[in-house]
From Swiss-Prot:
Glycans are attached at N88, N245. Coiled coil: none annotated. Disulfide bonds join C140-C177, C182-C192, C186-C198, C200-C209, C214-C224, C218-C230, C232-C241, C246-C256, C250-C262, C278-C288, C282-C294, C296-C305, C310-C320, C314-C326, C328-C337. This is Wnt inhibitory factor 1. Residues 348-379 are annotated as: Disordered. It holds the Pfam family EGF_DL_JAG. Expression highest in heart and lung. Lower in brain and eye. Its main location: secreted. GO terms for biological process: negative regulation of Wnt signaling pathway; positive regulation of fat cell differentiation; Wnt signaling pathway. It comes from Mus musculus.
Length: 379
């Protein structure tokens, strides 16, 4: 790996904005053959201090000269400026050597101003062999102006368990935070974070936390004013304004769904479901299910359920008089009107003066069989 140059002329500026991991120190007796590297890449350096060059912090396990005297540096070290929210460091274990790290402490000492520092890697792990970024974040809460003190304590060991690098014990760093101002302010207990965005408490949302969240949502134009509480418009009530307060009654099983409006069952219409869609009433127990359309009970058919059904019909010599009852024409009888009177006596001698016997129509019960239904008959 190519060596990166250290820049002693930048030391004072680095102390003012890079106080955390730059204060790593090497343990006494560190072996010279270690292959651990830590640096700030050119892009991050340009963002932080305006110079686009890599800034070396640790090379072959050894600290850059400008990071050695921590106590003197801490005495003159100002707080991290308001506009610096995080810093990126790049590290790498070159060759085959294995290094293990542990963040022993990430703690804010002024939690009303800044939350605990954050890192984008596990708190315990191995230094990667491929150059990788470690980001340390300084999360100001935006609730008030002030300077927050915090700790970042990390240790790096080799595969034999020897400490290679560590932050000094009881090292305290500082971050300047500012009370954020969100345009329009934050309502309902929300607070403006350092990005000037309102963070809303549970149950509220919106750019200013001005909207309450009701589950289920308010219906029929209801307004959610606090979490779970709807103000209903006139004519509605219920937890989520789902019920209508009808001033009129819905007849015939209709249901009021809006003030003055009813949902009518099939076959009925009108503002109060008082009108049938069938101009003439359905007969024999039939029910109106649409405009001029009846649903007939078993045994009847027709537009108005006025025609009885005989199963299996009355043949050519009878008519269906009642459900399953045939009325036979003169001279015929039987369940289906298919038997003729006197058919067996046609060739027998008749008494003198005797005439043909006239029979009155008779009612006979038919067997079970269905006739084709009419086109508008619904079984």
């Amino acid at each position: 790996m190519a060596r990166r140059r250290a820049f002693p002329a930048f030391a004072l500026r680095l102390w003012s904005i890079l106080p955390c991991l730059l204060l790593l120190r090497a343990d006494a007796g560190q072996p010279p053959e270690e292959s651990l590297y830590l640096w700030i890449d050119a892009h991050q350096a340009r963002v932080l201090i305006g110079f686009e060059e890599d800034i070396l912090i640790v090379s072959e396990g050894k600290m850059a000269p400008f990071t050695h005297d921590f106590r003197k540096a801490q005495q003159r070290m100002p707080a991290i400026p308001v506009n610096i929210h995080s810093m990126n460091f790049t590290w790498q274990a070159a060759g085959q050597a294995e290094y293990f790290y542990e963040f022993l402490s990430l703690r804010s000492l002024d939690k009303g101003i800044m939350a605990d520092p954050t890192v984008n890697v596990p708190l315990l792990g191995t230094v990667p062999h491929k150059a990788s970024v470690v980001q340390v974040g300084f999360p100001c809460l935006g609730k008030q102006d002030g300077v927050a003190a915090f700790e970042v304590n990390v240790i790096v060991m080799n595969s034999e368990g020897n400490t290679i690098l560590r932050t000094p014990q009881n090292a305290i760093f500082f971050k300047t935070c500012q009370q954020a101002e969100c345009p329009g302010g934050c309502r309902n207990g929300g607070f403006c974070n350092e990005r000037r965005v309102c963070e809303c408490p549970d149950g509220f949302y919106g750019p200013h936390c001005e909207k309450a969240l009701c589950i289920p949502r308010c219906m029929n134009g209801g307004l959610c004013v606090t979490p779970g509480f709807c103000i209903c418009p006139p004519g509605f009530y219920g937890v989520n304004c789902d019920k209508a307060n009808c001033s009129t009654t819905c007849f015939n099983g209709g249901t009021c769904f809006y003030p003055g409006k009813c949902i009518c069952p099939p076959g009925l219409e009108g503002e109060q479901c008082e009108l049938s869609k069938c101009p003439q009433p359905c007969r024999n127990g039939g029910k109106c299910i649409g405009k001029s359309k009846c649903k007939c009970p078993k045994g009847y058919q027709g537009d108005l359920c006025s025609k009885p059904v005989c199963e299996p019909g009355c043949g050519a010599h009878g008519t269906c008089h009642e459900p399953n009852k045939c009325q036979c024409r003169e001279g015929w009888h039987g369940r289906h009107c298919n038997k003729r009177y006197g058919a067996s006596l046609m060739h027998a001698p008749r008494p003198a003066g005797a005439g043909l016997e006239r029979h009155t129509p008779s009612l006979k019960k038919a067997e079970d069989r269905r006739d084709p239904p009419e086109s508008n008959y619904i079984w």
